[in-house]
């Protein structure tokens, strides 16, 4: 299944994302785990599709992302890749699959063969040698810093990161180490907006925020969160884009527009130090 796209639409590459960042054009990113939503996101102009290990929560009903396996990620990547025509496709390396550089490379090869254009991994400056190892072997990397859900038990829960001077300094080191190792995107989750803005200015590569303020180069949300599939309490950084819309397509287009014009995230969706 796919949608008939405008033939003038160009494939989104890492080079194009860098050009968007340099020009100050915001990048819209959303999750997808199946071909139907992948096709719709691509049709609506989402530049980056993330096959996140959040599928453990969204698709499997897990409380954390820890039970997700490499086989799960490869399967859902294949589903998304079949329908995606122009978006850059990023897939998470799941918990326990990148403990060493060699393990990370073997896992990344599996995901790239399934259709990913880039892999995402969670960690700080200690992970720089692994990122460098992957990049040297032609595996593009998105580095995920700040709140890293695979470390939920080590953190003692889902908590905003970088609120103290020491924590903020560590996140700056993490971001710089990831860029120096060759990461071509740095994703920041649950980071005070001012700090995320400072890091964005400090780096030359694009930054993507989720609960990290409006000054990042782009934004990402879990699709099912932003179309309000699940009733009840949402994370602070989530906005219900179904408000005022009658279709999911309308909600996705509203999200893309809000990211592009800078109206999302608003102050109510961000954290302070």
UniProtKB/Swiss-Prot annotation:
CDD domains: KPHMT-like. Its main location: cytoplasm. It catalyses: 3-methyl-2-oxobutanoate + (6R)-5,10-methylene-5,6,7,8-tetrahydrofolate + H2O = 2-dehydropantoate + (6S)-5,6,7,8-tetrahydrofolate. The active site is at 189 (proton acceptor). Pathway: Cofactor biosynthesis; (R)-pantothenate biosynthesis; (R)-pantoate from 3-methyl-2-oxobutanoate: step 1/2. InterPro entries: Pantoate_hydroxy_MeTrfase, Pyrv/PenolPyrv_kinase-like_dom, Pyrv_kinase-like_dom_sf. Keywords: Cytoplasm, Magnesium, Metal-binding, Pantothenate biosynthesis, Transferase. Binds 1 Mg(2+) ion per subunit. One of its GO terms (cellular component) is cytoplasm. GO terms for biological process: pantothenate biosynthetic process. It is found in: Cytoplasm. Its EC number is 2.1.2.11. It comes from the Bacteria. 3-methyl-2-oxobutanoate binds at residues 53-54, 92, 120. Its cofactor is Mg(2+). Pfam families: Pantoate_transf. SUPFAM superfamilies: Phosphoenolpyruvate/pyruvate domain. Belongs to the PanB family. PANTHER family: 3-METHYL-2-OXOBUTANOATE HYDROXYMETHYLTRANSFERASE (PTHR20881:SF0). NCBIfam families: panB (TIGR00222), PRK00311.1 (NF001452). Homodecamer; pentamer of dimers. This is 3-methyl-2-oxobutanoate hydroxymethyltransferase. The lineage of its organism: Bacteria, Pseudomonadati, Pseudomonadota, Betaproteobacteria, Burkholderiales. The gene is panB.
């Amino acid at each position: 299944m796919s949608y008939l796209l405008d033939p003038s639409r160009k494939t989104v590459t890492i080079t194009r994302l860098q050009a968007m960042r340099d020009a100050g054009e915001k990048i819209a990113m959303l999750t997808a785990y199946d071909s139907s939503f992948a096709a719709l996101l691509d049709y609506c102009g989402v530049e980056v599709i993330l096959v996140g290990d959040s599928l453990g929560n969204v698709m499997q009903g897990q409380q954390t992302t820890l039970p997700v396996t490499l086989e799960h990620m490869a399967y859902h990547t294949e589903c998304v890749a079949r329908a995606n025509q122009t978006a850059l496709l990023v897939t998470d390396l799941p918990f326990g699959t990148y403990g060493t550089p060699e393990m990370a490379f073997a896992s990344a090869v599996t995901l790239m063969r399934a259709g990913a254009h880039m892999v995402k991994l969670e960690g700080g400056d200690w992970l720089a040698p692994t990122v460098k190892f992957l990049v040297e072997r032609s595996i593009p990397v998105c580095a995920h810093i700040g709140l890293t859900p695979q470390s939920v038990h080590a953190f003692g829960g889902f908590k905003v990161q970088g609120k103290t001077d020491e924590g903020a300094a560590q996140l700056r080191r993490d971001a710089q180490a990831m860029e120096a190792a060759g990461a071509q995107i740095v994703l920041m989750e649950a980071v005070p907006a001012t700090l995320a803005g400072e890091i964005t200015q400090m780096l030359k590569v694009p930054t993507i925020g989720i609960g990290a303020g409006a000054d990042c180069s782009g934004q990402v949300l879990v699709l099912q969160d932003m179309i309000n599939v699940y009733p009840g309490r949402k994370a602070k950084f989530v906005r219900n884009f179904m408000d005022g819309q009658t279709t999911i397509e309308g909600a996705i287009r509203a999200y893309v527009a809000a990211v592009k014009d800078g109206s999302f995230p608003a102050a109510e969706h961000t954290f302070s130090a």
